[in-house]
């Protein structure tokens, strides 16, 4: 249990107690709703899924006309992203559905594999050797946030990367650490990244908002 006190912060666990003057929340799409009142109702987790093929032969790459190692994505609203990996495997990713259960994961494995075969029909016989998914994090205004959450400047976060966390998360982690240690000033960051996180309207309905967005964007993509 995490408690905020006048002296600082106390984290109590079954293994012991930890005290700190400053806290950074860096859990992104895995941030629990009740972890902090400063984040309640302000974040929306969304699943993203990835499959990876066995290494492709040069003949297979030629058959599909694939000639680059540069990551790419398509122009859909519910986009797919993909790249050839250094060992010749092909990585293909996209949204991960709205069911976080194990059964939902298997259903979406089939769905994303179908999408992969639709876009790359020459590789329909390429075995899928890896599949995983996880949560990305969305903010109401679809912009990351870096900075303090409380008026005392003792609770900090770098959060809401909207599926771009591999690059943005690394950069943001360094940025929030520099703010906390006073090696940088808030004004040195773009005001777009340091504005206050706004709450979603009627935040209890966020799962429905996400499902509705998928239906709408899916219809737009089908036009």
Region annotations inferred by a language model:
Residues 1-8, 18, 25, 208-209, ...:
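Extended alpha-helical regions
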Residues 3-8, 16-59, 63-153:
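Active-site substrate-recognition segment that forms the wall
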Residues 151-223:
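C-terminal lid/capping helical subdomain adjacent to the catalytic/cofactor pocket in oxidative enzymes
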């Amino acid at each position: 249990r995490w408690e905020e006190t006048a002296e600082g912060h106390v984290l109590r666990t079954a293994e012991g107690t930890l005290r700190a003057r400053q806290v950074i929340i860096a859990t992104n799409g895995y941030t629990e709703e009740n972890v902090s009142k400063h984040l309640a109702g302000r974040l929306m987790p969304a699943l993203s899924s990835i499959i990876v093929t066995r290494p492709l032969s040069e003949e297979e790459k030629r058959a599909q006309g694939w000639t680059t190692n540069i990551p790419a994505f398509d122009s859909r609203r519910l986009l797919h992203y993909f790249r050839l990996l250094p060992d010749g495997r092909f990585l293909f990713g996209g949204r991960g559905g709205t069911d976080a259960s194990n059964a939902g994961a298997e259903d979406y494995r089939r769905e994303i594999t179908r999408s992969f075969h639709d876009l790359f029909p020459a590789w329909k016989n390429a075995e899928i050797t890896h599949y995983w998914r996880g949560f990305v994090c969305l903010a109401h205004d679809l912009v990351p946030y870096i900075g303090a959450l409380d008026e005392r400047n003792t609770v900090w976060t770098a959060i809401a990367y909207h599926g771009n966390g591999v690059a943005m998360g690394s950069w943001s982690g360094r940025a929030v650490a520099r703010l906390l240690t006073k090696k940088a000033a808030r004004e040195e960051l773009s005001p777009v990244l340091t504005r206050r996180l706004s709450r979603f309207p009627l935040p209890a309905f966020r799962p429905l908002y996400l499902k509705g967005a998928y239906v709408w964007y899916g219809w737009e993509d089908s036009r």
